[in-house]
Amino acid sequence: MHAPCAASTVPASDPQETWPVGLNADLHCHSVVSDGTLTPDELARRALGNGVQLWSLTDHDEVGGQAQAAQAARSIGLPFLTGVEVSVTFADATVHIVGLGFDDTDTQLLQGLYATRGGRDGRAREMAQGLAQAGIPGTFEGALKYAGNPELISRSHFARYLVEIGICSDIPEVFRRYLTEGKPGYVPHRWATLRNCVRWIRDAGGVAVIAHPGRYGFNPTLEYALFSEFIAHGGQGVEVVTGSHFAHEYPKYADMAREFGLAASRGSDFHSPHESRVDLGALPPVSYTHLRAHETRG
């Protein structure tokens, strides 16, 4: 069950409009359903143990873990929002949009996510071909071992395999040497459009949030274009405090949230105890949110 939508009740235009101050919300993390290493149940318990007061599981392009996450959260008294992180192509780059507090049985949303996932297998096979040409064979099969959901095989799964076989010492090194643009294992992909992604989330009763905007490397003009188009399509929030940003970036995106009238969101982008830079619930707080009305209830 989903509480009534309140997607526009608390804009981020005034940092004094707070609810509630200091809430430990972690609204961005991943499970084995996509490219994380913990189950939804394990994540729920880790979140509670770390003092999280409002939690969302946001697997890539997939809501298959939502029922387990909601049940686990309910069983331990942890407030929960449905979540997903949708892959979008914007200006020939991949951008991620987090959806929060939506109906995870919505047909249009499910069909859109299915279509978005559809190209991952072919992309992964092309990545494996590129790595084989660079002298590293067998990476598709190796990456598949790490993919809890074969439909969602990703660069992270390739990275874990390359660390396993000793090609690199850690995952960041794999990305730097093999999996970013211009490297042997990089394959671009056309994802959902920004318009469609926001529409799926909004029509399912949810809140659309730009994930970790500082990670895309956009120049100021392109970043402004992203925010402007996102707003034009009905986008409602932006991650201001995220484990994918550095602390000096938080004020910039707080200012941009106020400038564009977007709600501020917070999330660790946690994937694994051994890989993630920030643990669940370990970020500085944001001072405003408008997502409580989307909490799922038993």
Report each predicted region and the residues it spans.
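An N-terminally biased module of ancient metal coordination in phosphate/nucleic-acid-related enzymes
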Residues: 2-93, 179-180, 192, 196-200, ...
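Alpha-helix N-cap/helix-start and coil->helix boundary motif
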Residues: 62-63, 106, 297
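Extracellular/periplasmic loop regions
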Residues: 277-283
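Extended substrate/RNA-proximal surfaces in nucleic-acid metabolism proteins
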Residues: 2-5, 14, 72-228
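C-terminal helical cap(s) of enzyme catalytic domains, especially alpha/beta-barrels
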Residues: 284-288
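Residue-level signal for threonine
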Residues: 31, 154, 296
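Conserved small/polar residues in nucleotide/adenosyl-binding loops
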Residues: 289-298
